[in-house]
Amino acid sequence: MECNVPVYQLRSGISRQLTTFRPDTRQKTLRVEPHQRLTLVQTEETGMVTRLWLTFPGWFWQHWNPNAEIDATLLRCLILRIYFDGNPFPSVESPVGDFFGVGHCEYRQYLSRFLGMSSGGFY
């Protein structure tokens, strides 16, 4: 589809949610092994990202058990890379914790205009 209006100025369109949930297996999570790269979303369509929500079960769910040991390095070791418009280099390359404002890898619920962290994940 040819469009002469910048995507951020579009006021109408179709909203879509891309998710890791697989109806065939009813799995909600993806397992990422050390040094493994995983593509979460890849599309050729025109559009914009309005929300990115990530949850790490082994990290968030441990906070509900005050006696559990938490591996704080997880948020420093998982690297988020976001590529746009066929660019071979990422427009975003950051540890997940830094990207969502949790650079010290400590659980702190917060809400801001653009980012937040709750017991359910990062957004």
What are the residue ranges of the model-derived segments?
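Beta-strand-centric surfaces of beta-sandwich/beta-rich domains
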Residues: M1-Y123
